[in-house]
Amino acid sequence: MQDPEKFSIESIKERLKERFPKEMDEIIYFFDLELICKFTLFLKEKNEVGGFFSKRDSMEILDRHVLESIYHVYRITKKIGSWKGIQLGDAGTGPGIPGFFFRCLKAYPVVVLIDSQKRKLSHTESFVRSNRITDLKFQFIRTEESKLSLNYVVSRGFIPYPYSVEAVSNLIKIGGTYVPFLGKHDIDVKLEEKVLSYSGFRLESSEDLSSLEFLGMRHIKFLKKISSPRHGYPRTWKDISKESKSGNGKDRID
């Protein structure tokens, strides 16, 4: 569905009611809608200069990026319970999606937006600075080269899963959790087990997000880091990317 003529708290509420009638009240309770509205207006205003979205997605920012992210954050927050004292990273964040929406919670973690390229994220950095938004950090680094030791990491539309696990393996402390945003359940189980094993992770749980069926199939996995990656991992971005493009990995959109 195309975006409303004007983004406002009311127009966002109306779309939330339409898309998530049973969960709308709880979603609104969790989030700072004023901050969501400000960020949504920023995404629209800076879309062309920042190259944030494709031509089609530029007409559906609210559904395909804002509401999708909000709903993921809502479901993850319900499972986690409290973000107090937690640092959460968003790998390959682009303009800050979905990571910024964790900062839009009323009770939020410290959020670290991570991307190796400044083209999109630098605009968000300026937006955060001009609005004096706290507890939001920026890291312009390659994920596989970083050792941030975060409690949680999420990713959306990043390098195809399960190779994304390898790429983020050094971002997360042992005992921490990686939550990739995924599409269909068409992942090679043996390949998944192999990558999780050498990256030091274990599958804890998986949740289908049936309320997002208007966008297609969506699900999330909760992957706990139980050990350091095996020697030689993670590999360079070039090697991970090359193998992931061989047709073995799956991202959230497929």
Curated annotation (Swiss-Prot):
Pfam families reported in the protein's UniProt record: GidB (PF02527)
InterPro entries linked: rRNA_ssu_MeTfrase_G, SAM-dependent_MTases_sf
Gene Ontology terms, MF aspect: rRNA (guanine-N7-)-methyltransferase activity
Keyword Methyltransferase belongs to the record: yes
Chain sites annotated for binding S-adenosyl-L-methionine: G92, R156
The protein's Enzyme Commission number: 2.1.1.-
Highest taxon listed in the record's lineage: Bacteria
GO cellular component: cytosol
Primary location class: cytoplasm
Keywords carried by this UniProt record: Cytoplasm, Methyltransferase, rRNA processing, S-adenosyl-L-methionine, Transferase
Compartment annotation: Cytoplasm
Keyword Membrane: no
Family assignment from sequence similarity: Belongs to the methyltransferase superfamily. RNA methyltransferase RsmG family.
Protein's job: Specifically methylates the N7 position of a guanine in 16S rRNA.
Designated name of the protein: Ribosomal RNA small subunit methyltransferase G
Organism annotation: Leptospira borgpetersenii serovar Hardjo-bovis (strain JB197)
Biological classification of the source: Bacteria, Pseudomonadati, Spirochaetota, Spirochaetia, Leptospirales
